[in-house]
Amino acid sequence: GLVSSIGRALGGLLADVVKSKGQPA
């Protein structure tokens, strides 16, 4: 559903942010 799609998108965005913060830029 729409909510699931939004949740998945937000989850992916959060994962990307955490990954970039965990690595030296």
Curated annotation (Swiss-Prot):
Keywords: Amphibian defense peptide, Antibiotic, Antimicrobial, Secreted. InterPro entries: Frog_Litoria. It holds the Pfam family Antimicrobial24. One of its GO terms (cellular component) is extracellular region. Its main location: secreted. It comes from the Eukaryota. It is found in: Secreted. Expressed by the skin dorsal glands. GO terms for biological process: defense response to Gram-negative bacterium; negative regulation of nitric-oxide synthase activity. Antibacterial peptide with narrow spectrum of activity. Active against the Gram-negative bacterium P.multocida (MIC=25 ug/ml). Inhibits the formation of NO by neuronal nitric oxide synthase with an IC(50) of 9 ug/ml. Belongs to the frog skin active peptide (FSAP) family. Caerin subfamily. This is Caerin 2.1. It comes from Litoria peronii.
